[in-house]
């Protein structure tokens, strides 16, 4: 199976039952989602009526927010149980989201074969650090993007600070995430991400860091990318 880590998939399969529990295993994503959604919507100049691809959509937290904003959303993931939960949750909330169990590489091949319309916006949030070949994902995201489209990538910097906050802090001390959710050696430095994006003929227009206050349980953005960060990219 191309560019899939079965151990990584099994982690998320095991946590799937609590995907939509705001106080469960995915509490950090529920807390982060309004910030990242607003950033994406603003930088994409609105989402209404736009064709959007959410790569690594999991249980559909971001996909649903974008669909509620009027986007025509396709969500893809290689997990089974989280995708079923995503489909059911969308139905319960009266949302039309096209969920598919596929890799972005295979979706790219199918789109090319069918000469299908490309996407105005592609998002790949907190997924690159969970796949064997991040460059392959980025290249396929670029191939599925319209010439004037916008790609959003988010991941975690490979720094001591990120290790202390994301692994030790979030997984072991605050217990906001199950232990073993992240592997430090898979974290991605911004320079590495930018090199891959350059190889995929993508230009970074902006990069911002996510930051979290555990006392207020609030996230905010600034220019410090030493931990979690998001990049906005366009085709060269």
Curated annotation (Swiss-Prot):
Organism (species): Haemophilus ducreyi (strain 35000HP / ATCC 700724)
Swiss-Prot/TrEMBL catalytic activity: a 3-demethylubiquinol + S-adenosyl-L-methionine = a ubiquinol + S-adenosyl-L-homocysteine + H(+); a 3-(all-trans-polyprenyl)benzene-1,2-diol + S-adenosyl-L-methionine = a 2-methoxy-6-(all-trans-polyprenyl)phenol + S-adenosyl-L-homocysteine + H(+)
Assigned protein family: Belongs to the methyltransferase superfamily. UbiG/COQ3 family.
NCBIfam families named among the record's database cross-references: UbiG (TIGR01983)
Pathway listed: Cofactor biosynthesis; ubiquinone biosynthesis
Keywords: Methyltransferase, S-adenosyl-L-methionine, Transferase, Ubiquinone biosynthesis
Function: O-methyltransferase that catalyzes the 2 O-methylation steps in the ubiquinone biosynthetic pathway.
Protein name stated in the entry: Ubiquinone biosynthesis O-methyltransferase
Keyword S-adenosyl-L-methionine tagged: yes
Source superkingdom: Bacteria
Keyword ATP-binding: no
One Pfam family cited in the UniProt record for this chain: Methyltransf_23
Molecular-function annotations in GO: 2-polyprenyl-6-hydroxyphenol methylase activity; 3-demethylubiquinol 3-O-methyltransferase activity; polyprenyldihydroxybenzoate methyltransferase activity
EC number: 2.1.1.222, 2.1.1.64
BP-aspect Gene Ontology terms: methylation
Matches recorded under PANTHER family: METHYLTRANSFERASE (PTHR43464), UBIQUINONE BIOSYNTHESIS O-METHYLTRANSFERASE, MITOCHONDRIAL (PTHR43464:SF19)
Binding site for S-adenosyl-L-methionine: 36, 56, 77, 125
